[in-house]
């Protein structure tokens, strides 16, 4: 495109730093879409249920932190402009999920995970490395990551108390969006990862979910 803006390496690094701050600082990410929980009734959960739901939403929030970092790392090193643009668009859409989860966590009188900076750094490194290897690998990581997220969401939807319609509305919309991201990445040429690679990613995701449920 004739009017496409071209950024220098310094510009891109500054943009990545800004994205990191907006991801990690409380309430700094502004959603593009209103929360699906708007209009749903607030149900008083007992203390045990509220703690459990807060733990689940904390896991999902950290998952979105990881997704942001993964996409930003890939956007930094992607070779083709269309792939870079796809990564940046996916990151923008994940901002909605990040903000929705954080808002719900606060409504449950809890807080995001203290481990978010660590997981952001690790995910950014993975994304940047994938982008350096090839755009097909980079897009494949998106698809495989979103598949993992969908599995987490399916499990969490089963665990939610039936009366918690706010959290359910958020997770159901996230599930739709994440599946679309995975499909788009594969259609754009993403590599379908073999089972051993997906198994390794599953193990890593379990480390994240177990640790962020409480911390």
Swiss-Prot record:
Pathway(s) served: Cofactor biosynthesis; ubiquinone biosynthesis
Gene Ontology MF annotations: 3-demethoxyubiquinol 3-hydroxylase activity; metal ion binding
Keyword annotations of the record: Cell membrane, Iron, Membrane, Metal-binding, Monooxygenase, Oxidoreductase, Ubiquinone biosynthesis
Gene3D superfamilies: 1.20.1260.10
Compartments (UniProt record): Cell membrane
Residues engaged in binding Fe cation 2: 94, 146, 178, 181
CDD domains in UniProt: DMQH (cd01042)
Bilayer topology annotation: Peripheral membrane protein
Cofactor binding mode and count: Binds 2 iron ions per subunit.
UniProt EC number: 1.14.99.60
Primary enzyme class: oxidoreductase
A GO biological process held by the record: ubiquinone biosynthetic process
Positions of Fe cation 1 binding: 64, 94, 97, 178
Cofactor(s) this protein requires: Fe cation
A GO term from the CC aspect: plasma membrane
Record's catalysed reaction(s): a 5-methoxy-2-methyl-3-(all-trans-polyprenyl)benzene-1,4-diol + AH2 + O2 = a 3-demethylubiquinol + A + H2O
Annotated family: Belongs to the COQ7 family.
PANTHER family in the record: 5-DEMETHOXYUBIQUINONE HYDROXYLASE, MITOCHONDRIAL, COENZYME Q10 BIOSYNTHESIS PROTEIN 7
NCBIfam families: DMQ_monoox_COQ7 (NF033656)
Full protein name: 3-demethoxyubiquinol 3-hydroxylase
């Amino acid at each position: 495109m004739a009017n496409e803006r071209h950024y220098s390496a310094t510009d891109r690094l500054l943009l990545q730093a800004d994205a990191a701050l907006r991801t990690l600082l409380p309430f700094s990410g502004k959603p593009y879409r209103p929360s699906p929980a708007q209009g749903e009734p607030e149900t008083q959960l007992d203390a045990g249920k509220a703690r459990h739901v807060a733990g689940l939403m904390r896991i999902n929030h950290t998952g979105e932190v990881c997704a942001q970092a993964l996409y930003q790392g890939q956007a930094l090193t992607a070779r083709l402009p269309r792939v870079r643009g796809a990564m940046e668009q996916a990151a923008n859409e994940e901002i909605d999920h990040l903000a929705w989860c954080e808002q719900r966590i606060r409504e449950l009188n809890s807080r995001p995970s203290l481990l978010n900076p660590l997981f952001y750094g690790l995910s950014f490194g993975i994304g940047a490395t994938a982008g350096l290897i090839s755009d097909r690998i980079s897009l494949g990581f998106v698809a495989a990551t979103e598949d993992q997220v969908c599995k987490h969401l399916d499990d969490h939807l089963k665990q939610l108390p039936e009366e918690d319609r706010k959290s359910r509305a958020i997770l159901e919309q996230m599930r739709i969006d994440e599946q679309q991201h995975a499909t788009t990445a594969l259609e754009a040429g993403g590599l379908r990862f073999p089972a051993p690679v997906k198994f390794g990613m599953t193990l890593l995701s379990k480390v994240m979910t177990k640790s962020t449920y409480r911390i």
